[in-house]
Amino acid sequence: DQEYNVSTVAKSGTVTFNAPWQGGFDLSGIYYVANKALNNIIKITQEGTCSVFSTETTFKSPMSVTFDSNGNMYIADRDNKAVKKITSGGTVTNYDMSSLKAGPNCMAVDKKGRIFVGTGGTYQLHMFDTDGTLKTVFGTGVVPTAATYSDGEQNDLSKATMGATFGIAFGPDEVLYITDYTMHTIRTLTPDAEGDYTKGTLKTIAGIPGTKGKIDGSALTATFNCPASVLVSDKVYIADEQNHLIRTITVNK
């Protein structure tokens, strides 16, 4: 087995951290993290130098920061019910979510520039199309139970359910990984042949719907307790919030 070392790369000093949430790397390798309780974004260089990211816009409980392939920054501005896009030149675009019951917890941007958004209270996955139109990808809008939990059918998400989510991330081949915080599962959403996620296929890949625990092993019998953030690289990494653990999901070959 591999051995790992843990070290602190950024800590309070010239800046103050208070409930740092999710972050992302820009194209030059600088890390930006949503500093939720202080309503700002912290910039962390590769040397560990921290500063408050300066912008003309203001935030209210920012939850997540991510970047697209062109270097544009996206911020989940939860309590303002908006996603903010900030270009390298400082231009800010506001993607409004005020029509929904809850603001954004997490985001992921695909290769076409569509912004996928997870929330804690709509019980749906949302998407801003390239023209800025807000759409529902799937979810009935009702909090699921173990009895009503459903992935829907292949290329038919009309009956698919979704709990709260704090983590979505794209993996290889534009498959979207989703943590279902309410139902303690990890799911994937694969688009149809035309790249349409609203007609895609949803699949639970890990966890037992509605069952809390911290059992490792075969993914569909393993258990989580409120899985939050997800990161996809060579493995799938899960922040298992209430178990206070970092978990990995690997594919058996």
Regions found by a protein language model. Give the residues of each.
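Loop/turn-rich, solvent-exposed surfaces of beta-rich toroidal or solenoidal domains
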Residues: 167, 179-185
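Gly/Pro-rich loop segments of beta-rich domains
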Residues: 2-21, 48-63, 89-105, 133-166, ...
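Residue-level detector of Asp-centered blade-edge/turn motifs that repeat once per structural unit
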Residues: 25-28, 67-70, 109-112, 170-173, ...
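Conserved beta-propeller blade signature
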Residues: 30-33, 72-75, 114-117, 175-178, ...
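A short loop-to-beta-strand structural motif that recurs across blades of beta-propeller domains
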Residues: 5, 39-43, 81-85, 123-127, ...
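Short loop/turn segments immediately following beta-strands, especially the blade-tip
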Residues: 189-197, 249-253
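Blade-level signature of beta-propeller repeat domains, shared across WD40, Kelch, NHL, RCC1
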Residues: 226-253
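Short loop/turn segments immediately following the C-termini of beta-strands
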Residues: 36, 78-79, 120-121, 181, ...
